[in-house]
Amino acid sequence: PQVALTIVLVMGAGYLGSSIVLVEGAQTLESLKDAMVFVCILLFGYPALIGAVVAYILSDMIEGVSPDVVWRWIECFPMTEAYCWIGYQFIGKDPDFRKLRTWGWYALFVTIFMAFVPPLWGFACGPLSGVFSAQDSYYKITPALFLTLVFTWILVPPLMLGALPLARRLGLY
């Protein structure tokens, strides 16, 4: 059930986030989808890794990314989840953001994630796949992704403060 629940939650968060416009014509609350991926991985562990990859692929296609582009990025989809797995190793056993210890490990995880994931997707979008030029990929996409991910990591703690007690009550954590 955790794989299916992850797919539903991530796709639902993607749909909701893409309908909330932060900057007209430029920025939606796409961060909500990424935050939900991390929340699901923290709550469900390994099954969420599988569900999140499927959810990202389906969500991108529903949002209008062509199957050709999705195929060119296919080996990159598990990358974000792999880095989230590092965060799971740090705080997955006790992801309670009411505890100071959780915040310390979370800060370390976010630092590692932000140092590597935006440039890796810059590479994936440009030189690896050829979808965008290297210039656009590194000087436009990478900084935009960095900014989007800042919102992601701001959203995770309040989401976890609500999701963890609910998951415990439902027997999912």
Protein language model features and the residues they cover:
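Single-residue recognition of alpha-helix boundary sites
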Residues: 44-45, 56, 159
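Residue-level recognition of pore/gate-forming positions within transmembrane alpha-helices
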Residues: 11, 56-57, 80
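Small-polar-interrupted transmembrane alpha-helices in polytopic inner-membrane proteins
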Residues: 52-60
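Generic transmembrane alpha-helix motif of multi-pass integral membrane proteins
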Residues: 33-52
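N-terminal membrane topogenic signal
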Residues: 1-6
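Membrane-embedded alpha-helical hairpins and interfacial helices in multi-pass inner-membrane proteins
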Residues: 7, 15-39, 63-173
